[in-house]
């Protein structure tokens, strides 16, 4: 009996050891070293990565075998965080850019810097400038892309945000589409064709000289150029026109002309942001602290186009560059001790140097971050709702986007656009694959650049402009710090980033390749919808990570964002009330206490 019990015990232990190897990676005499890969993706991406894993396993048959474990649902992040604390973490896994820094600080992620530097396949220099360094982090100073920063993950792809629009609805509203960017305007105005093969004569433009406008009128006829960003005013006018058609002609009382859930391209186009790094010699801090500037009300400034270069606060700026916060603000208003920042939020002033350069015409004045943020909030508020009162003037809503409460989350906005209830939608590249599957034959649709800040003279010439801005989505592929198969895990990541792996992802539609050259090839520009795919490439050049990436986690955002996306954007709370709210003002303290201490 004892012998039988011993045999049974040995068999159980063997089975358990096999399970552990499968869960954490290990050797398999027949298949080679096992690498466990957790993939958090939708059905389209899942099919692509199943094929990537299959091809990788065929290529490295007998050496490495990747075991893919699909993990779907919104709870993935929580599940991964718990798993990484234990001993059975996957070898390779997805980490969103919002959670990456905290995982690195907690020691969950393997330092893959040496793998990258020694790789003949993974060349950061060939990739979009922002996306790879997004994952280069110094866990001591909590800063990105410093000389001491290390890579704890690499992007599997990049998904820029663009303006999706329903071309069927545009045409129904009497809008003519043209497609010619700034570089092609001279040739187009001289009689050449736009990217759709149309001349000015074909489009009824006659002798009119087309300017750098996204939405304009010629002889009573409306035009939309899907290759040039609209201004804020053009966006509102275009949305109102199509919305009127949807409601009055199509009898869709719940149709809307536009929707965006992100303020980034509104604030960033004029040089604003929600936090600013302030230098400090306080020994308890890391050499800096963060000030909360979501509604900072000093004007922003940009170097005029006819000014080659100038010095501001000892720093050289060239034409079209926005002056950074620390160079425009009189920093003597700040102290090394950040205590009481909330009480000082209205006290900061622009330097005399900046004001003088603006008076000389070398700098152009742009709206403040608060102005830009207010513009964003006005989109959803009804036309009889007071969003704010500025210098005695009541600012009402535009009523061109649905309230967040009525549209729901990601699924709600996606379904609304697919069903023709939204004429324009700001969204990421990943949704392209869904639109291809669900909208084929129902509606024509395409993409355009995100709106940006611009002012025009009476003839439609730009007099003042901001910069193109927006955020791109990205997910990192990371290796567990507890893995026993790091070299093999890196081989798989290399394959995902190779031309073959990136091509497979690009063809499915949910991302654009990491490499610039590959993105500019037929691999990405393959003729599938949307026709104006080059807009994604344009966006990838300048878009950066969202505010959720700035610090190690989202806790500093959640308190004020819940009020913003609740009462404020749903028309129940004015901007001034939001500015004075407890939820807004507690953020100053949270930033210092939880994110800047040594």
Residue ranges and their predicted role:
Residues 1-35, 592-598:
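Short, low-complexity disordered leader/linker segments with a strong preference
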Residues 28-30, 48, 412-415, 419, ...:
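Mature extracytoplasmic/periplasmic domains
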Residues 31-42, 64-69, 92:
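Short, well-ordered beta-strand elements
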Residues 42-63, 164, 168, 269:
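Short, polar/charged alpha-helical segment
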Residues 55-138, 168, 172-173, 178, ...:
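Extracytoplasmic "Venus flytrap"/periplasmic binding protein-like
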Residues 97-160, 189-202, 297-309, 446-450, ...:
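Hinge/lid segment of periplasmic solute-binding proteins
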Residues 234-243, 279-408:
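Glycine-centered hinge/linker elements that transmit conformational signals in sensory
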Residues 312, 319, 326-332, 339, ...:
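Conserved C-terminal helix/tail region of periplasmic/extracytoplasmic solute-binding proteins
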């Amino acid at each position: 009996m004892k012998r039988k019990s011993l045999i049974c015990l040995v068999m159980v232990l063997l089975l358990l050891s096999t399970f552990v190897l499968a869960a954490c990676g290990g050797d398999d005499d027949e298949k080679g070293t096992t690498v466990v890969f957790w993939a958090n993706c939708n059905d389209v991406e899942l099919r692509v990565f199943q094929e990537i894993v299959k091809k990788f396993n065929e290529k490295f048959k007998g050496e490495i075998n990747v075991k893919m474990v699909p993990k779907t649902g919104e709870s993935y992040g929580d599940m991964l965080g718990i798993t990484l604390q234990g001993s059975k973490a996957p070898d390779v896994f997805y980490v969103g850019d919002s959670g990456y820094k905290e995982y690195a600080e907690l020691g969950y992620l393997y330092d893959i810097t040496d793998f990258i530097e020694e790789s003949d396949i993974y060349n950061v220099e060939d990739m979009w400038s922002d996306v790879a360094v997004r994952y280069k982090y110094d866990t001591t100073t909590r800063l990105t892309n410093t000389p001491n920063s290390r890579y704890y993950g690499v992007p599997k792809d990049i998904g820029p945000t663009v303006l999706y629009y329903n071309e069927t609805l545009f045409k129904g509203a009497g809008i003519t589409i043209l497609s010619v960017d700034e570089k092609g305007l001279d040739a187009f105005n001289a009689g050449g064709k736009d990217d759709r093969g149309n001349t000015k004569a074909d489009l009824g433009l006659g002798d009119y000289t087309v300017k750098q406008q996204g939405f304009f009128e010629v002889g009573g006829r409306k035009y939309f150029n899907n290759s040039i960003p609209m201004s804020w005013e053009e966006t509102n006018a275009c949305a109102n026109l199509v919305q009127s058609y949807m409601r009055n002609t199509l009898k869709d009382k719940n149709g809307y002309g536009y929707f965006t859930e992100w303020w980034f391209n509104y604030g960033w186009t004029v040089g604003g942001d929600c936090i600013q790094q302030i230098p400090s010699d306080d020994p308890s801090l890391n050499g800096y602290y963060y000030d909360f500037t979501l509604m900072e009300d000093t004007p922003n400034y940009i170097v005029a186009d006819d000014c080659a270069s100038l010095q501001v606060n000892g720093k050289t700026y060239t034409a079209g560059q926005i002056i950074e916060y620390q160079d425009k603000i009189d920093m003597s208003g700040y102290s090394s001790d950040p205590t009481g920042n909330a009480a000082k939020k209205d006290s900061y002033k622009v330097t005399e140097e900046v004001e003088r350069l603006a008076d000389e015409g070398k700098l152009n004045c742009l709206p403040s971050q608060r102005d830009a943020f207010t513009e964003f909030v006005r989109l959803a508020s009804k036309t009889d709702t007071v969003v704010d009162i500025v210098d005695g003037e009541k600012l009402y809503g535009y009523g061109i986007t649905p309230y967040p409460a009525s549209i729901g989350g990601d699924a709600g906005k996606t379904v609304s656009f697919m069903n023709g209830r939204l004429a324009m939608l700001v969204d990421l590249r990943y949704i392209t694959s869904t639109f291809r599957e669900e909208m084929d034959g129902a509606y024509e649709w395409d993409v355009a650049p995100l709106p940006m800040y611009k002012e025009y003279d009476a003839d439609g010439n730009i007099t003042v402009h901001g910069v193109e801005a927006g955020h791109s989505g990205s997910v990192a592929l990371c290796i567990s710090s507890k893995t026993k198969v790091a070299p093999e895990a890196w081989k798989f990541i290399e394959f995902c980033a190779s031309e073959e792996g990136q091509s497979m992802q690009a063809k499915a539609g949910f991302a654009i390749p990491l490499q610039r050259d590959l993105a500019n090839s037929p691999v990405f520009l393959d003729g599938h919808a949307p026709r104006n795919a080059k807009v994604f490439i344009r966006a990838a050049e300048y878009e950066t990570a969202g505010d959720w990436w700035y610090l190690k986690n989202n806790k500093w955002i959640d308190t004020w964002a819940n009020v913003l996306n609740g009462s404020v954007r749903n028309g129940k709370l004015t901007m001034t009330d939001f500015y004075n709210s407890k939820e807004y003002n507690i953020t100053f303290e949270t930033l210092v206490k939880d994110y800047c201490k040594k």
